[in-house]
C-alpha cells in the first residue's frame, strides 16, 4: 500500500465538492497560541472513554484537539495522575489506540492514524471473523460497500429520541413519520434506497447480531420493534456488501443496533431527554430516562444492566406511550483464547394510536385524533448466549444461540368492526461462524464459513365486535382468524477475503433453505411451501492510500414468502421468494480531518409481494428498479484557517430513482413513499465546555400509491406528499469531571415550525399524519 500523503487545504476543498462524519474538537478556554506545550503541568484524569479523556485534557491544557467520533469510538484511555508535558500527556492517553497527535501550529492538534505497513510486509495474520463486530472506524473504512455508523455521541448531538430519527439522517434511508398500524413509538418504519418503508420489512434488522423481528422468516415486520435508542451505543447501517453473511430480508441491507458496552471499570451513567411541542395538542412532557450500571472485574467477569423508559404523548391527541426496556448483559473472558457472553432482554410497552385524518379533518385540526379505540401493546423476552474461541490470530470460532418470545396485540377500528388481534411468536436459533486465515504465495486469505438454524412458530388470532355496539372485543368475542404458522430455515455461507497488494477481493455465496407452512384452524386448511435461494456475491476494495479507497460489489439478496403471503404463492403454483441483484461502485476518504464518500447503486428487484391491510389481501407488484447516488462529507474548518478552530461542517445527499418495472398501467411510476432527493446539512462549533449544533434535513415529494395519484382523496390516503425542509438547533455545556461529567443541553426541533405531513394508504387507519411541529427539548447526563 502506498504511503499516506497529506492533502493541502485546497485539495481538501476540492474533495468537499464530491465526497462524510462529524468532527469533534476539544478546546480549552485559553488562547491556544499562548500555551507552552513543553511546560510540565499536573494532570489528573481517570481511566475513561478516549473521547471524554481528550475533552478533559483539552480543557485543562487550553488547547484545541480535533478528532472524529469514529476515531475514538470503542477506545478507552489510561488514567493520568502526575506532571506531564502536553506531548507526554497526549502520548499517554493515546497509547495502544493506533492514533497519534499531530501539532498543526498555534497550539492546535489533530488525531491521525499511525502509519500502517503494506499488507505484503506484515508478519502477523489476523482474522476479522464477524464483519459487523463493534462497528469500529477501521471496520467501516474497510467495508466493501456503502456503510454508515451513527454513534451515541452523534445521535445525542442530533437530539434524537428514537431510532427513527437516527435512521432518517443516513444517506439512502427513508424513515417516515409513524403512520398506519405503525403509528406509535413501539413500531419502526424505514426503507432503504426507495424500498417501501412500511414496518421495515425489506431489511435484515439485528440487535447485537440477534434478529429483531418477532418472526424473521414468517413475519419480518416491525409493528413491534423492541429497540430503544437509549440502550444503544451505535446504529450500524450496511446498505451494500453484506448479503452473504446476513439475512434473510437483505434486499434493503442490514441494520444492526449495537447495545451499550459493559464498562471496563464500575460505572453508573444516567441521562434524561424530555420534549414538548407547545403549539400542538401535547398536554405534557414526553420523557425518556436511560440508565447503565456495570463494570468488569480483574478476573475478566463483567456485567451491565441497561434500562430505557419512555412516558408521555407526542404532538397528536390520543398518543400516550409507555415503554420499559430492560437489558442484562454479561461477559466472562478467563483468557485471551476463550470468551463467554450472554444477554437477556424484557421489553414491554403500550401506546395509543392517533390514526390518519381525512382531508377535511386535517384542515380543521391536524393534531386531533378521530380514532378513540385504536391502541397497540406488546412485549418481548429475549435470551442469548455466545462462546468465542480464538486459539491464535489466524483462527476464530463463534457459536451463538438465541430464543425470543413475543406478544403483539391491539385494538383497531376497521369500519364495521372493532377488532382485537393478539399474536404470539416463538423463535429459536443457533448460529456458528468459523474463520481461518492463511497465506498462499503473495496473497493472504481469510476463509469464513457459517451456518444458522432458525425455528419459528406463530399463533395469530383476531376477535371482533360490531363498531356500532361501542364495546371493545375480548378473547371471549367472536373470532374470524385463527392461524398457526411454522418455519424451519437453514442458512449456509462461505466466503474468502483475499488481500493481494493494494487489493482486497471477497467472493462468496449464501444459500437459504426454507420450509414454511400456515394452518387455518377455522377453515381446517393448510398452505405450505419449500423453497431455497442461492445468493452469490463478489466484493472488492482497492486502496489508493491508507486514507482513500475505491470499492465495488455485486450481490444477490432475497425476501421470504411470509405467512400472510403463503396462500397467494400457493394459488399461483410457483412458490418463489422475492429476489434482487444489487450493484455498487464507490469511493471513501478519511484522514481524520476530512471524511467523504461517494457511491452509486443499482437494484433490480423481482417477484415482489405487497400486502394491503385494509382489504386483507396480497397482490404482486412484481418488478421494481432502484438506482441512484449517495454522498456524504464532513470537514474540520480549522484545516483551512486556525481562526476557524472549533468549527466543522457536514452534509449528505441521496438521489434515488425507484420505479415500477412490471408491465401494466403503473409501469414507469415512482415506487410509493420514495423521494428522489433527500439529504442533510449542518455545522458544529465547540469552544471550551460549550458545544453548539445547527442541523437541516430535507426531502422532495412522494406518492402514496402505485398509481402515483396526484390529487388528494377525500379520506387523505392518496395524493402527492409534498416535500419539506426543517432545521434544528442545540446547545450544551459540559461541567467536566469535577461534577461527574454532568452535561446539560437545550435544543429545538423544526426551528421555523414548518408544517409537513405523510400519508398511510393501505392501512385501516389510513389518512394524513402531520409532522412534528416546533419542539423544545432538554437533555441531561451524569456519570459516577
Q: Where does each model-flagged region fall?
A:
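Membrane-embedded beta-barrel scaffold of Gram-negative outer-membrane proteins
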Residues: 291-293, 386-390, 396-412, 543, ...
Amino acid at each position: 500500500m502506498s504511503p499516506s500523503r497529506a492533502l493541502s487545504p485546497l485539495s481538501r476543498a476540492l474533495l468537499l465538492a464530491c465526497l462524510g462524519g462529524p468532527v469533534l474538537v476539544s478546546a480549552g478556554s485559553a488562547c491556544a497560541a499562548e500555551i507552552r506545550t513543553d511546560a510540565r503541568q499536573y494532570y489528573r484524569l481517570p481511566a475513561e472513554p478516549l473521547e471524554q479523556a481528550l475533552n478533559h485534557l483539552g480543557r485543562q491544557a487550553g488547547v484545541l484537539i480535533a478528532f472524529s467520533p469514529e476515531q475514538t469510538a470503542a477506545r478507552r484511555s489510561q488514567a493520568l495522575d502526575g506532571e506531564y508535558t502536553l506531548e507526554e500527556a497526549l502520548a499517554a492517553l493515546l497509547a495502544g489506540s493506533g492514533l497519534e497527535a499531530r501539532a498543526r501550529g498555534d497550539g492546535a492538534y489533530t488525531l491521525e492514524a499511525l502509519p500502517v505497513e503494506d499488507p505484503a510486509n506484515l508478519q502477523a495474520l489476523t482474522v476479522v471473523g464477524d464483519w459487523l463486530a463493534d462497528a469500529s472506524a477501521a471496520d467501516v473504512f474497510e467495508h466493501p460497500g456503502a456503510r454508515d455508523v451513527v454513534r451515541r455521541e452523534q445521535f445525542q448531538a442530533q437530539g434524537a429520541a428514537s431510532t427513527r430519527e437516527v435512521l432518517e439522517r443516513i444517506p439512502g434511508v427513508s424513515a417516515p413519520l409513524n403512520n398506519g398500524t405503525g403509528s406509535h413509538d413501539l413500531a419502526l418504519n424505514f426503507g432503504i434506497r426507495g424500498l417501501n418503508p412500511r414496518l421495515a420489512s425489506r431489511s435484515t434488522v439485528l440487535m447485537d447480531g440477534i434478529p429483531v423481528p418477532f418472526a424473521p422468516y414468517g413475519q419480518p415486520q416491525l409493528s413491534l420493534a423492541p429497540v430503544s435508542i437509549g440502550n444503544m451505543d451505535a446504529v450500524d447501517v450496511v446498505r451494500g456488501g453484506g448479503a452473504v453473511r446476513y439475512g434473510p430480508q437483505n434486499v434493503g441491507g442490514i441494520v444492526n443496533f449495537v447495545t451499550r458496552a459493559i464498562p471496563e471499570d464500575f460505572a453508573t451513567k444516567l441521562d434524561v431527554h424530555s420534549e414538548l411541542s407547545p403549539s400542538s395538542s401535547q398536554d405534557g412532557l414526553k420523557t425518556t430516562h436511560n440508565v447503565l450500571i456495570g463494570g468488569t472485574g480483574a478476573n475478566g467477569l463483567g456485567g451491565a444492566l441497561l434500562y430505557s423508559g419512555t412516558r408521555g404523548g407526542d404532538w397528536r391527541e390520543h398518543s400516550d406511550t409507555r415503554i420499559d426496556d430492560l437489558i442484562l448483559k454479561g461477559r466472562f473472558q478467563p483468557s485471551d483464547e476463550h470468551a463467554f457472553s450472554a444477554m437477556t432482554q424484557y421489553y414491554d410497552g403500550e401506546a395509543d394510536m392517533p390514526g390518519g385524518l381525512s382531508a377535511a379533518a386535517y384542515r380543521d385540526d391536524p393534531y386531533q385524533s378521530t380514532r378513540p379505540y385504536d391502541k397497540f401493546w406488546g412485549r418481548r423476552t429475549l435470551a442469548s448466549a455466545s462462546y468465542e474461541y480464538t486459539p491464535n490470530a489466524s483462527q476464530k470460532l463463534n457459536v451463538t444461540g438465541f430464543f425470543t418470545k413475543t406478544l403483539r396485540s391491539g385494538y383497531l377500528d376497521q369500519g364495521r368492526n372493532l377488532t382485537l388481534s393478539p399474536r404470539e411468536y416463538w423463535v429459536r436459533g443457533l448460529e456458528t461462524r468459523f474463520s481461518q486465515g492463511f497465506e498462499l504465495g503473495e496473497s493472504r486469505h481469510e476463509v469464513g464459513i457459517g451456518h444458522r438454524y432458525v425455528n419459528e412458530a406463530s399463533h395469530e388470532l383476531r376477535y371482533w365486535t360490531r363498531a356500532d355496539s361501542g364495546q371493545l372485543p375480548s378473547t371471549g368475542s367472536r373470532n374470524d382468524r385463527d392461524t398457526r404458522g411454522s418455519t424451519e430455515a437453514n442458512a449456509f455461507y462461505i466466503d474468502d477475503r483475499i488481500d493481494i497488494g493494494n487489493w482486497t477481493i471477497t467472493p462468496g455465496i449464501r444459500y437459504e433453505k426454507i420450509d414454511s407452512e400456515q394452518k387455518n384452524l377455522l377453515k381446517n386448511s393448510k398452505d405450505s411451501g419449500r423453497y431455497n435461494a442461492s445468493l452469490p456475491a463478489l466484493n472488492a476494495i482497492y486502496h489508493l492510500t491508507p486514507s482513500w479507497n475505491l470499492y465495488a460489489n455485486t450481490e444477490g439478496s432475497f425476501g421470504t414468502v411470509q405467512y400472510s403471503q403463503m396462500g397467494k404463492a400457493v394459488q399461483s403454483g410457483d412458490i418463489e421468494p422475492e429476489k434482487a441483484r444489487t450493484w455498487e461502485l464507490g469511493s471513501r476518504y478519511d484522514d481524520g480531518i476530512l471524511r467523504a464518500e461517494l457511491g452509486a447503486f443499482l437494484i433490480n428487484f423481482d417477484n415482489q409481494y405487497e400486502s394491503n391491510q385494509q382489504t386483507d389481501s396480497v397482490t404482486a407488484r412484481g418488478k421494481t428498479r432502484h438506482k441512484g447516488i449517495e454522498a456524504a462529507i464532513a470537514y474540520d474548518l480549522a484545516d483551512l484557517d486556525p481562526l476557524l478552530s472549533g468549527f466543522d461542517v457536514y452534509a449528505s445527499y441521496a438521489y434515488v430513482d425507484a420505479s415500477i418495472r412490471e408491465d401494466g398501467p403503473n409501469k414507469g411510476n415512482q415506487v410509493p413513499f420514495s423521494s428522489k432527493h433527500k439529504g442533510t446539512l449542518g455545522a458544529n462549533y465547540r469552544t471550551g465546555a460549550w458545544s453548539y449544533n445547527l442541523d437541516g434535513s430535507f426531502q422532495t415529494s412522494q406518492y402514496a400509491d402505485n398509481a402515483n395519484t396526484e390529487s388528494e382523496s377525500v379520506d387523505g390516503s392518496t395524493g402527492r406528499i409534498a416535500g419539506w425542509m426543517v432545521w434544528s438547533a442545540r446547545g450544551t455545556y459540559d461541567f467536566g469531571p469535577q461534577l461527574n461529567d454532568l452535561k446539560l443541553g437545550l435544543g429545538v426541533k423544526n426551528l421555523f415550525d414548518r408544517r409537513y405531513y405523510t400519508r398511510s394508504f393501505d392501512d385501516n387507519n389510513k389518512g394524513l399524519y402531520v409532522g412534528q411541529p416546533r419542539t423544545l427539548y432538554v437533555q441531561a447526563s451524569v456519570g459516577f
